[in-house]
Amino acid sequence: EQQKYLNAKKYVKLVLVADYIMYLKYGRSLTTLRTRMYDIVNIINLIFQRMNIHVALVGLEIWSNRDKIIVQSSADVTLDLFAKWRETDLLKRKSHDNAQLLTGINFNGPTAGLAYLSGICKPMYSAGIVQDHNKVHHLVAIAMAHEMGHNLGMDHDKDTCTCGARSCVMAGTLSCEPSYLFSDCSRREHRAFLIKDMPQCILEKPLRTDVVSPPVCGNYFVEVGEECDCGSPATCRDTCCDAATCKLRQGAQCAEGLCCDQCRFKGAGTECRAAKDECDMADLCTGRSAECTDRFQRNGQPCQNNNGYCYNGTCPIMRDQCIALFGPNAAVSQDACFQFNLQGNHYGYCRKEQNTKIACEPQDVKCGRLYCFPSSPATKNPCNIHYSPNDEDKGMVLPGTKCADGKACSNGRCVDVTTPY
C-alpha cells in the first residue's frame, strides 16, 4: 500500500494570489500580471516534474481593488494572515490543495518567502508567501517552488546536500546561480513526509477543465484543446501522440488510459481493474473510451461480516479508524464514551454549521468524535480521542460508518441505510 502510494503520480492543485501592490507594480494591467503569473507556474511545474508531481493552476486571483488581508513586511505575520484567509474564505469557494501569495511588498531582512513545513492538504497550513523580488520571472518561480517544497515536507539543504549543480531548490539562501534541481536531502525528506503523513489531496488528478492557465503542449498534462501530451518532441516516447501538436497520430484512438492498448481502445467487457475488496466491483472497458470507470457496490450493502456497510467503494468501520489513529492494538471505546458528543464543545460534537459546532442528538452520538481505547499499559483513559485544532475533522467518525443495525453515519447523523446517503 505504501509503495503504491509513493509510486502514484501526484498533483498539486494550486491557487496563485497576487496582492494590490503587484497590481500597481505591473501598471494596473491584469493581462501583464496574469502572464507573469502563468510564466511562474509553468516554471514551477517544470521543477516539480522531476519529483513526479504535476502543479496545476486551478485558480488565479488578483487583488485589484484592495488587499483582502493586511500585507506587511513581517513575513511571519503575513503568512499567518494569508493562511487564515485561505482557510476561512478561499477554501470555501474554490477547491484546491495549496495557495501561494505573490506580493510586491519588501519583506524584512533577506527573506524572499515563507511557508509552513509539511502543510500540504492541511486547511490551515497549505500555504506560502513569496516576494516578487526579481524582474526575471524564473528566479521568482524558483523561490515559490522552494516555499512549496517546504509545504511538501522539505527543509533547507545543509552543506552536505547535493543535486549536481552549484545551488539546489531548497538552498537556505537565494543564489545568483540557481537550478531547477532538488537535492538528495530534499528527495529523502519529501519521501519521509509522504510515508508519515500520506497526504491524500495530491492523489486527485484535476480535470482538464479545472486548469485556468493557457494550455502548454509538452508539460505531460492533457489540457483543454489537447488530445494527448507526452512531453517535448525530444523526450516523448509515445508512438500514439504527436509531441509537437499534442494531437493523436493518424489512426490512433488514444494515447493513455487503462483501456488503451497500442493506440486503440480495448474491447468492450475487457477487465481493466480488478475488484479490490467486497465493496468494490471489477471495472470493465466500454470499447468506446480509454478510461476505466470506477464502479463499486451500492451503498448500504453489508461488509466485513456485517460489522459495516459499503460506502462509495469502501467498508468504513470504527475499529479500523481507531487502528489508523492509535496503532494496531486499538479498539473502539465503550458506548458511555460517546456521550461526550452530546456536549457540543471544542471536540465533542456531530457536525459544524457556519463554523458553529452542533452537539449530537442522543441517537447520533456515534457519528461525531470517535472514541478509542488504545490497548497499551501506559494508557488508563478508556475514552481516547484524536483532536487537533489545526485539523478538527481528523478523528471524527468517517461518513458511511455503521452506527447501529441498519444505520450509517451521514453528515453527523445516524441514518437508515435504505435511504440515499
UniProtKB/Swiss-Prot annotation:
Keywords from the named record: Apoptosis, Calcium, Cell adhesion impairing toxin, Disulfide bond, Fibrinogenolytic toxin, Glycoprotein, Hemorrhagic toxin, Hemostasis impairing toxin, Hydrolase, Metal-binding, Metalloprotease, Protease, Secreted, Toxin, Zinc
Any single GO CC term annotated in Swiss-Prot or TrEMBL for this entry: plasma membrane
Superkingdom assignment: Eukaryota
Residues spanned by motif D/ECD-tripeptide: 278-280
Entry-listed glycosylation sites: 312
Main location: secreted
GO biological process: apoptotic process; proteolysis
A Gene Ontology molecular function term of the record: metalloendopeptidase activity
Disulfide bridge partners, by residue number: 121-201, 161-185, 163-168, 217-246, 228-241, 230-236, 240-263, 254-260, 259-285, 272-292, 279-310, 303-315, 322-372, 337-383, 350-360, 367-409, 403-414
Positions of the Disintegrin domain: 214-299
Binding-site residues, Ca(2+) 2: 280-281, 283, 294-295
Named cofactor requirement(s): Zn(2+)
Compartments where found: Secreted
Residues the entry annotates as binding Zn(2+): 146, 150, 156
Record family assignment: Belongs to the venom metalloproteinase (M12B) family. P-III subfamily. P-IIIc sub-subfamily.
Described function: Snake venom zinc metalloprotease that induces apoptosis in vascular endothelial cells (VEC), without degrading the extracellular matrix (it cannot cleave collagen) or inhibiting adhesion of VEC. Has also fibrinogenolytic and hemorrhagic activities.
The name this protein goes by in its record: Zinc metalloproteinase-disintegrin-like lachestatin-2
Species lineage: Eukaryota, Metazoa, Chordata, Craniata, Vertebrata
